Amino acid sequence: MDKAELRRAVISRRDALDLDARAAKSAAICARLVELLDRLDAAAPRTVAVYAAMGSEVDPAAFAAAAAKRGWRVAYPCMLSAIDAAACGQRMCMRAVAADDTSAAPFIAHPTRAFAATDIDSSRFPIVPAEALDMIVVPLVAFDCTGARLGYGGGCYDRYLPMLSPACQIIGIAFDEQRVDHVPTDAHDLQLPHIISA
């Protein structure tokens, strides 16, 4: 099965989970993320990147709220316009969002839309340099026991993750139903060191 076929099959399987099961599994995954967060030294200001769930993805919103309550700065991906992406060599950046400001962040409401730098209030939603992240929660479509990750095919995280500090905790999250025997990979595909599933 090639990547496109696997992607369709696993998304269909994920979509078939009923809403209550998805909510319960998302809550269990968020609880495990909070446990991990609590084990990290929070003496210094810390920053975690999460994502806004789309469709039937694991929803990390409860984890983001818990991180903010613990004093962590929370950042979300913002897709870049073609001009901005060409200028920086990346298709996305991370922008900090205050806990009470998530509903006003257009890149949270529209996570796949590309925004020009001038579209976003950078004083309200500042860009967080990749090397400033202490933890990042990565969405995925499918995964296997080796940590291989299948995303949506855009390569955004495969290009972004190498820019992180070696100390950054990288965690993929998924439902158990997204586990497969083997994820086909190419040279640019990165394995995730940690995947939490339920």
Report the location of each language-model feature.
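Short glycine-rich anion-binding loops that position phosphate/pyrophosphate groups of nucleotides
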Residues: M54-S56, V141-C145
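Surface-exposed, charge/polar-rich loops and edge strands
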Residues: M1-E5, L19, D121-I127, E131-I136, ...
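N-terminal active-site beta-alpha-beta segment that forms phosphate/nucleotide-binding
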Residues: M1-A132
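Conserved residues at the C-terminal ends of beta-strands
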Residues: Y51, P139, A198
